[in-house]
Regions:
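A polyanion-binding, active-site-adjacent surface
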Residues: 2-220
Length: 220
């Protein structure tokens, strides 16, 4: 099981941000980025889910205040990174839970304005950490990272999976990966025999091929 982040790793850039009134009203806490500020990777998701306040410590960023701390997606993505293996800083393109007006326990897609309001935070995190690569989990996270680099997604998302994109505007390389909710379905359709095959392909797509896997066993 992946390690749960320590509270002091939480990188609150604006503790009570209210740029988006709807999100300020729907969130419980802002799910800020967390992890080493000199990490090899920055992992970017779309936005935190509602989470489960009654779960163990993996309650989700809406309750922990830290990105990628949900029981399903959070642990699954952290397990992927642990298997690469590299240290990672985890964040979301939109930091607050975007509640669906019809069902406040479910997510809606963040609006273009909400993405734009949060984009300076995302760009600041990436530039501050200065990772060798950014792993964007899913289409919307990929689009948000590209927008922060003044770029856009060319073609379909599945064609972009594990196809590195140099982002000199952010000083890093973007590597789109499958969203954890759909990984098991789509990795087979994309030709990966099993999870180990997919993890090896993710590692190979990184600029270093996986920092510790390429001769840096004793680092960190």
């Amino acid at each position: 099981m992946p390690e749960f982040p320590e509270p002091e790793e939480r990188n609150a850039l604006a503790e009570d941000c209210r740029r988006c009134p709807a999100l300020a009203g729907s969130r419980t806490r802002i799910a800020w980025g967390n992890g080493p500020r000199d990490a090899d990777l920055v992992v970017v998701g779309e936005a935190p889910a509602a989470g489960n306040p009654d779960a163990d410590r993996w309650r989700g960023g809406n309750h922990t205040g830290m990105a990628y701390t949900s029981r399903h997606s959070g642990r699954q993505v952290r397990r992927l990174v642990a298997d690469l293996p590299d240290e990672a800083y985890y964040t979301n393109a939109v930091k607050c839970f975007p509640a669906d007006p019809g069902d406040p326990t479910d997510n809606r897609e963040p609006t273009a304005e909400e993405r734009a309001n949060c984009r300076p935070y995302l760009a600041a995190e990436i530039r501050d950490v200065a990772p060798e690569a950014v792993l964007a989990t899913g289409k919307h996270a990929t689009q948000s990272v590209l927008a922060a680099a003044d770029r856009s997604l060319a073609g379909g998302f599945l064609d972009a999976v594990l196809d590195p994109v140099a982002c000199p505007e952010l000083g890093t390389t973007l590597v789109p990966v499958l969203h954890p909710s759909y990984e098991a379905v789509w990795r087979a359709r994309l030709g990966y025999e099993d999870r180990a095959d997919y993890v090896a392909a993710v590692r190979a797509a990184l600029p270093s091929g996986g920092r510790r896997d390429s001769g840096d066993e004793d680092s960190g």
